[in-house]
């Protein structure tokens, strides 16, 4: 189940930006109560829209089959398309999102058009506690999430190098993967990725978020357990060395709104600029047309830049 995958995209984006607003502690009590109610309301709307509530929708959107990946303590559900390409493009979703957060049409068959557009094998999956993946009650920190990504990649890559594409919190996961497995990585794409130089949380914030998610999704849901680790996650990623020297593209939203003024967006941009340390082929693309979910509002922008990375790689 996703964090805020409501049919009304503007509501989803507004919710997400509120979650990642670093000064929420300044909100008055009545505003906090309002946010809690809205999160639960939008979560219910999300559940309905993401599972296609009507019979007509179910008939129109036949579910794309997945493959289970055994990571020892639980199983994850992965979705792939094979074209026997030299490289494998792997998508890592953000906090609170399952693999469908990459589907701008909302149809599971979109994985086929993504693969066709990239002319490449592609792999998407759901972390524990999302979609059809199993639950895991262990600490869901970045190191654990990266370890599970390694298992998923190993099952599908068959020795090939991968192009990693990470959205939001997924950016932290692919960073850790690339640094720990430089020999397996051919390229990187960061889509409005989280970064420790921007994202800062107090324990009170984490408690508020966790209680909301526990109420909406359950204490063992992926979003709830990942939330508990956010403070430690950003402390951990602050200790990571530079990324491997592979082609890297960062795509960043510079769209302003009531919660994100120009100064805030500049800090967001600057945090992604730090990814270029030690990288000789670095491109930073900005957009004011999309909010946090660039892959949904401007899917072609994201796919074109993934394709650009793939085109640079040795044949």
Please give the residue ranges for each predicted region:
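Conserved serine/cysteine hydrolase catalytic core
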Residues: 218-286
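Bacterial Sec-dependent N-terminal signal peptides
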Residues: 19, 45-65
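Active-site loop/oxyanion-hole signature of alpha/beta-hydrolase fold enzymes
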Residues: 124-163
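Conserved hydrolase catalytic core segment
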Residues: 160-197
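Conserved HGGG/HGGXW glycine-rich cap/lid loop of the alpha/beta-hydrolase fold
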Residues: 77, 81-132
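Catalytic active-site module of serine/aspartate enzymes centered on a nucleophile-bearing elbow/loop
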Residues: 290-315
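Bacterial N-terminal signal peptides
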Residues: 37-47
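Flexible "cap/lid" loop of the alpha/beta hydrolase fold
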Residues: 191-220
């Amino acid at each position: 189940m996703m964090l805020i995958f409501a049919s009304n995209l503007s509501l989803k984006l507004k919710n997400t930006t509120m979650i990642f607003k670093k000064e929420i502690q300044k909100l008055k009590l009545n505003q906090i109560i309002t946010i809690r109610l809205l999160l639960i309301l939008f979560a219910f709307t999300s559940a309905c829209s993401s599972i296609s509530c009507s019979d007509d929708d179910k008939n129109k959107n036949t579910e794309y089959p997945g493959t289970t990946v055994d990571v020892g303590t639980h199983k994850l559900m992965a979705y792939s398309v094979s074209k026997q390409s030299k490289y494998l493009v792997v998508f890592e979703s953000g906090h609170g999102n399952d693999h469908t957060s990459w589907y701008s049409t909302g149809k599971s068959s979109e994985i086929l058009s993504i693969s066709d557009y990239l002319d490449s094998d592609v792999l998407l999956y759901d972390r524990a506690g999302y979609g059809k993946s199993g639950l895991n009650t262990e600490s869901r920190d970045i190191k654990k999430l990266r370890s599970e990504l390694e298992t998923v990649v190993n099952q599908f890559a068959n020795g090939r190098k991968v192009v990693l594409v990470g959205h939001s919190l997924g950016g932290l996961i692919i960073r850790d993967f690339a640094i720990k497995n430089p020999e397996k990585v051919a390229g990187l794409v960061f889509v409005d990725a989280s970064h420790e130089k921007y994202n800062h949380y107090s324990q009170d914030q984490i408690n508020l978020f966790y209680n909301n998610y526990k109420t909406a999704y359950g204490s063992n849901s992926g979003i709830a357990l990942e939330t508990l680790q956010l403070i430690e996650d950003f402390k951990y990623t602050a200790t990571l060395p530079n990324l491997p020297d592979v082609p890297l593209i960062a795509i960043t939203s510079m769209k302003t709104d009531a919660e994100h003024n120009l100064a805030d967006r500049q800090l967001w941009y600057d945090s992604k600029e730090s990814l270029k340390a030690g990288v000789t082929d670095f491109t930073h693309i900005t957009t004011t047309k999309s909010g946090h979910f660039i892959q949904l509002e401007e899917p072609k922008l994201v796919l074109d830049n993934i394709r650009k990375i793939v085109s640079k790689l040795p044949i």
